[in-house]
């Protein structure tokens, strides 16, 4: 599903322009991910909205995005499966052009339970999602970004790992690991 450029009529006035840029925002059919996609589109970027499970919600979010006058596409795919990530990136590139901005905002459900009610498998599932996803997404995008000598990778973090939120330990641990990985990647890749 794609949209073509139209004169944007948006509620936000931007102090910067992303005209000529293309963004991929994972988990962008609801909440923060959708707000980020809309803001990037408002600033003139072509944005690929990503979803995995709920096609109807994805299509509704994309229509909401398009109604703002922004250009983009909707792409389904898993952000924790290497071959699927490669397919997502290739599809966005063929539809919108090279990706300049990658926003990693996808998230699974985050239940609240006492520590003793979680098992290690659920902790591992959270770590797999919040560390594996940014790693695989960055690994897919870095060669492309380095080749064109431009790119931005934005990982959406959370303050929960600093605050130690109770009944949320798997998510807190995973977001702490994601934050450490992101800081290390930023130090390695900074100009």
Kindly give the residue locations of the regions a language model identified:
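Residue(s) in the substrate-gating loop at a strand-loop-helix junction
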Residues: 158
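Conserved glycine-rich Rossmann-like NAD(P)H-binding loop of the short-chain dehydrogenase/reductase
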Residues: 45-60
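Active-site helix of classical SDR
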Residues: 138, 174, 182
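Alpha-helical segment proximal to the catalytic Tyr-Lys
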Residues: 143, 187-188
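Conserved glycine-rich cofactor-binding loop
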Residues: 22, 29-30
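The beta1-alpha1 cofactor-binding region of Rossmann-like NAD(H)/NADP(H)-dependent oxidoreductases
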Residues: 55, 76-88, 120
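Catalytic Tyr-X3-Lys loop
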Residues: 116-135, 150, 154, 171, ...
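Conserved mid-core segment of classical short-chain dehydrogenase/reductases
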Residues: 86, 107-124, 147, 167-170
